[in-house]
From Swiss-Prot:
Superkingdom classification of source: Bacteria
Locations listed in the record: Cytoplasm
Ranges for region Disordered: 289-331
Gene Ontology terms, MF aspect: rRNA (cytosine-N4-)-methyltransferase activity
Main location class: cytoplasm
Name of the protein described by the UniProt record: Ribosomal RNA small subunit methyltransferase H
Organism listed in the record: Cereibacter sphaeroides (strain ATCC 17029 / ATH 2.4.9) (Rhodobacter sphaeroides)
Known EC number: 2.1.1.199
Lineage of origin: Bacteria, Pseudomonadati, Pseudomonadota, Alphaproteobacteria, Rhodobacterales
One Pfam entry name: Methyltransf_5
Biological role: Specifically methylates the N4 position of cytidine in position 1402 (C1402) of 16S rRNA.
Gene3D superfamilies: Putative methyltransferase TM0872, insert domain, Vaccinia Virus protein VP39
Amino acid sequence: MAEADTERRPHIPVLLRPLLAAVAPVEGTWLDGTFGAGGYARGLLEAGADRVIGVDRDPLALKMASGWAGDYGDRLRLVAGTFSQLDSHAGAPLDGVVLDLGVSSMQLDLAERGFSFQKDGPLDMRMSQEGESAADLVNTASEESLADILYHYGEERASRRIARAIVEARAAAPITRTLALAEIVARCLPRPKPGQMHPATRSFQAIRIAVNAEFSELVEGLEAAERALRPGGRLAVVTFHSLEDRIVKRFLQLRSGGEGQGNRYAPETRAYAPRFTLPLRRAISPDEAELAENPRARSARLRVGVRTDAPAGKVDPQALGTPLIPKKGRR
């Protein structure tokens, strides 16, 4: 029932109109690396793209798209996979890449996927529905590792207090439900005032990022987009929180000419020809009309880069400000 309800509910892609305007003209072959409910892919096809490759690691997203994807014939190809390997999914140089980061509305709305702290469901949070779940992490990670994850991936100042409460709670019984975890976190923090975010927001974000390795996926995906785009090809990335937005912002800054500025910590830094140009002076945020239509868009930011003909290369995740968890063992 939940799946059917989500399929009927119209999907509102965040910042679609400004994205299409920023990457115009839309033509040739595009890759939507976070296909989800297909809103960006449809928008690109209707705006003039000859072909769109839709990539998603969530098998449910691709299953739900099977009912309408055939309407576009061979103009839309769906691929099960991650956007960190988008260049291998493309098979040929691309005219554009779109990435809509984080958890999708579909995943949030389905309680059984375990992403929401407002709906009771199994503590899962796996986008691919494979591998270690959030329950596995919460019930087996050491208190120190949990605190590191909450602090570095969620910017949660009360990380140690929350980690201690989790360890104490799981000693009595395994934590297997989303609302159970949300209540443990909420008891560690002051009651929010009207209009403030739910106290479990940062903790759920952090655990989700850890379960899905979202930051390494993002860095590798940006590198893959650089390899896959032809000269003049567009990269458009929509972010939803400051940590991932910082990574995208620094990537585009460095790849558009910020490299080669050596310092006493990296005196051997070489200068490279810019791999991207930046058509936007700053990130685009939703306007009031979009926020009224889709309140979930409030934290969204759109950044765009245009590929040059300079050779692609590797990037240092630390140079992008990627949060790193100290390597001292999880268990």
